Curated annotation (Swiss-Prot):
Membrane protein topology class: Multi-pass membrane protein
Any GO CC annotation of this UniProt entry: plasma membrane
Parts of the chain that traverse the membrane: 46-65, 69-91
Subcellular location: Cell inner membrane
The keyword Membrane belongs to this UniProt entry's keyword annotation: yes
Family: Belongs to the UPF0208 family.
UniProt cross-references to Pfam families, sorted A to Z: DUF412 (PF04217)
Keywords recorded for this protein, A-Z: Cell inner membrane, Cell membrane, Membrane, Transmembrane, Transmembrane helix
UniProt-listed InterPro entries: UPF0208
Protein name: UPF0208 membrane protein Ent638_2839
Organism (species): Enterobacter sp. (strain 638)
Amino acid sequence: MSTPENPSVSFFSLFRRGQLYAKTWPLEKRLAPVFVDNRVIRITRYAIRFMPPIAVFTLCWQIALGGQLGPAVATALFALSLPMQGLWWLGKRSVTPLPPTILNWFYEVRGKLQEAGQALAPVEGKPDYQALADTLKRAFKQLDKTFLDDL
């Protein structure tokens, strides 16, 4: 993600944007070869579900076996930070402007939605990945799967 992001986004709002982006992005198998987002969202959801219990287990296990408190806490904090890293990455991704090749495809999908009679809000500024996620989610609901053939 070497493209400039929206500078007005605060650190903590990236986590909320990451959650919204993960809920919005369509987890379709045909998008997986092109976008890494499918894998990151699945891994982040897995980490949100399983890392807190793993952190508690490793902390209790190391303390119960007479281990030192410092490494036990460090291991638990690392396990707890993994879901946050995923949400942060997704938040950064959601505000990243689309590269030119994906931008052209974004406008093609929007055009197909408008041809199908769907009312779309006008795009404000340069579209980002959140706008792409919203458009793709709507396209998967309203259009047939052939709109992905030119991807």
